[in-house]
């Protein structure tokens, strides 16, 4: 695979490397929009300025910039608060959609690292927030509940430190088992601004063609800033085969939910990771990933962790103090 010494700068935002040499390097923006590839590896390189994400591809044909069969690695230079999980959904807001009615979603949590929004979360009990495992920070995190406008110190807000991070034990930094519980240092005070969202009573499969709610404070577009107010959008569930065609082995049909969106109704983007997918008023998923820098591209399905699959794990973790 690729090594750090093989990386070469090809733009201010990207480095590239190949395992078999490069015949010609082009600026990343010159790559075809619909580049037929198979995602094969992703590296995390921890440095003083945050995590660097490298995504490697094996092209299915001889491209203008490589020899046939070479491996390309694209290194995304991103600060930790905007850490991207394949897509950037992990530091994300809603593309399109609309501003939520203030405090209409009292279960929404903003996970903050160094006082900056990094991920979404869902309050599921007064002492637990559910989110994505890839949202785990390298240092202390604070959960902000009862918020609408993150620029303000609203009286409705409750800021509670995370006492313990409890990611799934099988999460390895890839895309499966991407679920985590946050044990709060203090119990949240339940009121009209802060209220847990119930988990499904029993596991059920999620049907295709369902319109589902998503919400978050993430980016409003690939090159746009984070939203400071809570936004919401609508995503529509797709057959698992649609995601399997694009994401290959990285899409686990039992563990994940596949969705699409239109730009008017909105969809997830960087910073929305860990937020909810709510179908028929029931919590069904956790925002996980989509294509890097392509959160507003409807060619690439969005992926959510399937809560139904992990219900036994969630309940066991919350009921057993020694586990979380």
Model-identified regions with their sequence ranges:
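C-terminal helix/juxtamembrane-tail motif
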Residues: 2, 21-25, 29-34, 38-56, ...
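Aromatic (phenylalanine/tyrosine) cluster motif
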Residues: 7, 14, 35-37, 57, ...
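Cleavable N-terminal signal peptides of Sec/SRP-targeted secreted and luminal proteins
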Residues: 10-18, 59, 67-85
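Extracellular trypsin-like serine protease catalytic domains
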Residues: 28, 108-114, 210-324
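Conserved H-D interstitial segment of serine endopeptidase catalytic domains
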Residues: 80, 91-93, 111, 129-132, ...
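Catalytic histidine site
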Residues: 101-140
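Active-site substrate-binding loop(s) of clan PA
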Residues: 154, 166-170, 187-230
């Amino acid at each position: 695979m690729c090594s750090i010494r093989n990386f070469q700068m090809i733009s201010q935002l990207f480095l590239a490397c190949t395992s078999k040499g490069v015949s010609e390097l082009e600026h990343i923006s010159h790559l075809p929009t619909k580049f037929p590839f198979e995602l094969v590896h992703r590296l995390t390189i921890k440095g003083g300025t945050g995590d660097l994400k490298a995504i490697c591809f094996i092209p299915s044909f001889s491209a203008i910039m490589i020899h046939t069969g070479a491996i390309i690695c694209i290194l995304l230079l991103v600060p930790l608060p905007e850490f991207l999980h394949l897509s950037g959904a992990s530091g994300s807001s809603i593309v399109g959609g609309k501003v939520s009615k203030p405090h209409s979603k009292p279960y929404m949590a903003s996970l903050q690292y160094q006082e900056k929004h990094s991920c979404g979360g869902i309050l599921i009990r007064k002492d637990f927030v559910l989110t994505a495992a890839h949202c785990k920070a390298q240092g202390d995190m604070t959960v902000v509940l009862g918020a609408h406008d993150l620029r303000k110190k609203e009286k409705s807000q409750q800021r509670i430190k995370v006492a313990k991070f409890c990611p799934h034990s099988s999460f390895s930094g890839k895309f499966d088992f991407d679920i985590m519980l946050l044990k709060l240092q203090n119990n949240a005070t339940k009121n009209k601004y802060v209220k847990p969202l119930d988990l499904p009573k029993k596991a059920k499969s999620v049907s295709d063609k369902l319109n589902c709610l998503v919400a978050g404070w993430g980016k409003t577009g690939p090159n746009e800033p984070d939203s400071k107010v809570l936004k919401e959008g609508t995503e529509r569930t797709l057959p698992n085969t649609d995601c399997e065609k694009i994401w290959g082995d990285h899409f686990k049909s039992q563990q994940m939910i596949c969705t699409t969106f239109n730009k008017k109704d909105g969809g997830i983007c960087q910073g929305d990771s860990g937020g909810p997918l709510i179908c028929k008023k029931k919590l069904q998923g956790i925002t996980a990933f989509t294509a890097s820098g392509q959160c507003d591209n409807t060619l690439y399905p969005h992926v959510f962790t399937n809560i139904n699959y992990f219900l036994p794990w969630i309940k066991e973790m919350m009921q057993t103090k020694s586990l979380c």
